[in-house]
Amino acid sequence: MKTATITTDINIGPFKIPSNGQNMIMNNYAERNNLIVEAVIPEPMMSNALATVQWLHNNKRFKKVILCSIHQLPIEQDRIENLIKNMEDVEFHFALEGICGRGRKFLLECIKEANMFMKAKTIDSTQNSWLELHKMMKDKLK
């Protein structure tokens, strides 16, 4: 079984994780889940198309790939369709979310969750104390 980790740009959704940090996160995930990483694939900076891994998949036939987060998946519809078409049979693991799965439905659900998260309103925690943030949370639950 061929398993690969994929590093991408430092900007991963709401996170900023340099490639060495991404490698540490994915290697830790692989170790905890008894996965043996056989390839490390760096994607180009400023790209979330995952084109390099798709190109290599044509020759290497990966069974599993590990990414840090669902936020590394493509956003543009044509890139999403290319990824699904080329890698629908591959098992995707997302280390930060702790989820894995394969197929069109799984990937589309991950992309939907990432999009929903990115549209969520953020609270400027520098303008509020922890007590104010806690009160805001409790008020929302009422």
Regions found by a protein language model. Name each.
Residues 1-142:
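Short, structured surface patches at the beginning of a domain
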